From Swiss-Prot:
Keywords: Acetylation, Cytoplasm, Transferase. Residues 3-83 form the GST N-terminal domain. GO terms for molecular function: glutathione transferase activity. The modification N-acetylalanine is found at A2. It is an enzyme of class 2 (transferase). Catalyzes the conjugation of glutathione to a large variety of electrophilic compounds. It catalyses: RX + glutathione = an S-substituted glutathione + a halide anion + H(+). Liver. Pfam families: GST_C (PF00043), GST_N (PF02798). Homodimer or heterodimer of GSTA1 and GSTA2. It is found in: Cytoplasm. This is Glutathione S-transferase A2.
Amino acid sequence: MAEKPKLHYSNIRGRMESIRWLLAAAGVEFEEKFIKSAEDLDKLRNDGYLMFQQVPMVEIDGMKLVQTRAILNYIASKYNLYGKDIKEKALIDMYIEGIADLGEMILLLPFSQPEEQDAKLALIQEKTKNRYFPAFEKVLKSHGQDYLVGNKLSRADIHLVELLYYVEELDSSLISSFPLLKALKTRISNLPTVKKFLQPGSPRKPPMDEKSLEESRKIFRF
């Protein structure tokens, strides 16, 4: 029996959460080795496990993979969540780059200066409502299918629904004008593997709070 993937990161969402989501949606059980101190991170670096001296790092299939996109690409390919041909893969890549653009803004929001947060939140709300959500609503409307690409579950659906949850935490009203996105969120959330991941006690991480922010500052020395 193959070993479970082992995820090396701190006990926060950060850049590992999309990896947790994708593995969970694929029905893959995984272990987490939490980095709890700067010394834990130094040990991984000194042992030569981090090619570019940074996490996330995932041990899978005899490899120690770093760089979030590389890890996600491997998982999506391995578990048939990356389209059936190069055209579908290109569409998936295009969609997830857009998802990542908005996701990055949300990811970095808690780390910004307090006096900047209101303006940055307003920018996220504006771009969500006027740029990103309309684009994905249009895709779903254009083909009338249940999923973004090829009428089959792909990583694009999973990453988008993860993003929808994050946006909902910031402003639950933003999705109200996008019925097809709401339907996609419900559809993906009801998949057995995703439903399990959304339950309390799963490896899914909560939003960043002051305590986890301070712990992150100590671990990553910023």
